[in-house]
Regions:
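Short, flexible active-site-proximal loops enriched in glycine and acidic residues
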Residues: 1-9, 39-45
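A short acidic, helix-capping loop that chelates divalent metal ions and anchors anionic groups
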Residues: 13-18
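An alpha-helical appendage that flanks or caps ligand/catalytic pockets
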Residues: 20-52, 92-219
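Well-ordered beta-strand positions
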Residues: 36, 79-80
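Structural motif
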Residues: 76-77, 220-222
Length: 250
């Protein structure tokens, strides 16, 4: 079948409860146990035996990953990875290499790890308006990608303090909520990060601009994009993607 299981450390749903996302070693333990359940129908997890006897086939396990350590972990233990490090050519190449490093460290074939890039998307004939509509999503991507550390993530030194402030002031209760008045959207403007975050995490602009951006990613090695529609009119956006962007890549 086409089903796969995606696992992440926990984002707004966890932090809104006052909890903390899972650490990498917790992720490793959990993912290894889940994969063993699908292959051996039995696994040890946190000192207990778990059994899952009904699966007819192994479901691929993917994880979300943003930095060098999590991307290497994905290469070590996962079938695939959803990459949130960024979309620029150098970041695409970095992510691929980190995943390949992890696979080699685990004695796996690096070419067998499926790689998808998470892309916040708003295709519009009015790029300025599209960018305004997408600010809260840019804040969310930055907060998630940089939450634990900026190390190894190519954040320009002159922007590091501003990124750290975004992390400190990010409002999880307004996670990815639309509206110019939302705190997270305003933060992006107040900190002067809008253009940088759009270039790093998003596909925003006219259809021609988006096509050119995807081609640059493909030239750097990206093969699969997970597009998330950002904006108040999602049916219009989906139609724009279908009619004006995707035909260039079929």
């Amino acid at each position: 079948g086409r089903a796969f299981l995606g696992i992440g450390p926990g984002d707004s749903a966890v932090y809104n409860l006052g909890l903390r996302g899972a650490r990498l070693e917790q992720m490793r333990e959990y993912i290894v146990a889940v994969r063993e359940l699908f292959t051996r129908h039995e696994a040890q997890y946190q000192g207990r035996t778990a059994r899952l006897t009904w699966p007819q086939r192994r479901v691929p396990v993917y994880m979300s990953a943003e930095g060098p350590r999590s991307l290497r972990l994905a290469g070590q233990v996962c079938d695939g990875v959803v990459i949130g490090l960024g979309l620029t050519p150098e970041l695409v190449r970095d992510a691929i290499e980190y995943v390949r490093q992890g696979a080699r460290e685990a004695g796996r074939n690096p070419d067998e790890i499926d790689k998808w890039w998470l892309v916040k998307t708003n295709v519009s004939d009015d790029p300025r308006q599209a960018l305004e509509e997408s600010r809260m999503a840019l804040a969310a991507s930055a907060n998630h990608a940089f939450r634990f550390t900026l190390e190894g993530k190519r954040v320009p030194p002159e922007l590091a303090d501003r990124v750290e402030r975004l992390k400190r002031e990010y409002v999880y209760a307004e996670h990815e909520k639309l509206g110019a008045e939302r705190k997270n959207a305003r933060l992006v403007d107040e900190l002067g990060l809008k253009e940088y975050l759009a270039e790093r995490f998003a596909l925003i602009g006219t259809a021609d601009q988006c096509v050119a951006r995807v081609r640059r990613m493909a030239e750097a090695g990206a093969t699969s994009l997970l597009l998330t529609a950002i904006g108040p009119d999602k049916p219009r956006l989906i139609k724009s993607l279908s009619d004006r962007v995707l035909p260039h890549f079929r």
